[in-house]
């Protein structure tokens, strides 16, 4: 079992149940999935960019990403319907907790000029989104073998009903929020 999953079950869930005054353990907010998305607008002219992004995300997550395609043509962005424009991967269960553990303990401390995560990046329903400017903060990526620095979006989907519940959950996981 993943380390964070065990910590959640034994320490975080009982503490949150008391803190949020919930009647049942199943009401306690939990992280259901983590979605990593890499938007690649520059991939329009070059297939190699998509292949490299897929390889990077696969190294980071240990799971094969899905290529996303444009749903409709937009002349302003010079894209046509059906062209590949990004890659995404959804992590659940043990892989999700292992990724979250690596993100909090290894990757975020490696971010340059890191002052904490924005505590206002909740969507109103307890889900949290954050952006990473460079994929090299992950130790799985070899700096010498990358072709370009690419950012990615990380979304944590939770069962929390409000932002305050979601914030309490992530604080219990020791997320480094800015004050």
Curated annotation (Swiss-Prot):
Say if the entry is tagged with keyword Iron: no
What are this entry's molecular-function GO terms? RNA binding; rRNA binding; structural constituent of ribosome; tRNA binding
Alphabetically sorted, this entry's keywords are: Ribonucleoprotein, Ribosomal protein, RNA-binding, rRNA-binding, tRNA-binding
Superkingdom is: Bacteria
The UniProt record lists the keyword tRNA-binding? yes
Q: Which InterPro entries match?
A: Ribosomal_uL5, Ribosomal_uL5_bac-type, Ribosomal_uL5_C, Ribosomal_uL5_CS, Ribosomal_uL5_dom_sf, Ribosomal_uL5_N
Record GO biological process: translation
Cellular component GO terms held in the UniProt record: cytosolic large ribosomal subunit
This chain's function reads:
This is one of the proteins that bind and probably mediate the attachment of the 5S RNA into the large ribosomal subunit, where it forms part of the central protuberance. In the 70S ribosome it contacts protein S13 of the 30S subunit (bridge B1b), connecting the 2 subunits; this bridge is implicated in subunit movement. Contacts the P site tRNA; the 5S rRNA and some of its associated proteins might help stabilize positioning of ribosome-bound tRNAs.
Q: Which family does it belong to?
A: Belongs to the universal ribosomal protein uL5 family.
Q: How does it assemble?
A: Part of the 50S ribosomal subunit; part of the 5S rRNA/L5/L18/L25 subcomplex. Contacts the 5S rRNA and the P site tRNA. Forms a bridge to the 30S subunit in the 70S ribosome.
Under NCBIfam families, the record lists: PRK00010.1
Query: What is the protein name given in its UniProt record?
Result: Large ribosomal subunit protein uL5
Please give the organism. Pseudomonas aeruginosa (strain ATCC 15692 / DSM 22644 / CIP 104116 / JCM 14847 / LMG 12228 / 1C / PRS 101 / PAO1)
